[in-house]
Amino acid sequence: MDPQQIKAALGSGLLSFPVTPFDAENRFAAAPYQKHVEWLSGFDAPVLFAAGGTGEFFSLTPDEIPAIVRAAKESAGKTAIVSGCGYGTEIARGIARSVEAAGGDGILLLPHYLIDAPQEGLYAHVKAVCQATGMGVMVYNRDNAVLQADTLARLCDDCPNLVGFKDGTGDIGLVRQITAKMGDRLTYLGGMPTAELFAEAYLGASFTTYSSAVFNFVPALANKFYAALRAGDRATCESILNSFFYPFMELRSRRKGYAVAAVKAGVRLVGFDAGPVRAPLSDLTGEEEEILKALIDAHRE
């Protein structure tokens, strides 16, 4: 898939990022992963992000990532697969090349490791990764890797395969400046934790889609919310926010890392063998899983 094709796919509907299942020995479990990806691909997501943030990219080795991408491609049907990519520049370049060799359709460039960097350094990092692959690249603006509008414009000038921008800062002023400056040069995705909580604000800033974590275990509900959002049906959006997303937010906020662990628990609760989260995260308690189960059961479509 060429960069412009993945750019179009990213903007064509609701997106998600499958959790990465691990077995009893803490190894990637391909068979249950493929079963889950196949199920998700039946709910019309144009793109799934393999080995993304909710897929515990931060806990994966670079060698595991292409194996996950291959497993996703084999089971996703016509759904495009974009892989997580990141760490230091040279590691990220290597991951990008390995994802392309594994048949991936693009990469999501997550923040580099640990250190803060000036805009010129961020520019050099993103440019180097873009130049390592012919695939479309999406940058994830968050934490220690926040590109300003002028830096992003330079990158778009110099990197024709930079086609997407995902925001995890929540800084609506900055993202509106970026969409005003960049226009249709990029596809824009909301990327805050539990993105539905922020979707209406981002829609006002010209972000027409986002990646939904809960799509992993309640895809029909996620699609219902997204359809209402795009139709301007505020009553339906508020009903789902109050009955599902705000209670889920309360559970997710109980402990650091639950933005991932709660999603993985949800996948297990709807019948998939997702396994545990890897350290340094921790799984929900039994009591918390019961709370989540009741929430899911009340919203089965």
Curated annotation (Swiss-Prot):
InterPro entries in the record: Aldolase_TIM, DapA-like, Dehydro-deoxyglucarate_dehyd
GO terms assigned for molecular function: 4-hydroxy-tetrahydrodipicolinate synthase activity; 5-dehydro-4-deoxyglucarate dehydratase activity
Top class in the EC scheme: lyase
Pathway in which the depicted protein is active: Carbohydrate acid metabolism; D-glucarate degradation; 2,5-dioxopentanoate from D-glucarate: step 2/2
GO BP terms, alphabetized: D-glucarate catabolic process
NCBIfam families registered for this protein in UniProt: KdgD, PRK03620.1
Protein name as catalogued: Probable 5-dehydro-4-deoxyglucarate dehydratase
Protein's organism: Cereibacter sphaeroides (strain ATCC 17029 / ATH 2.4.9)
Lineage, top ranks: Bacteria, Pseudomonadati, Pseudomonadota, Alphaproteobacteria, Rhodobacterales
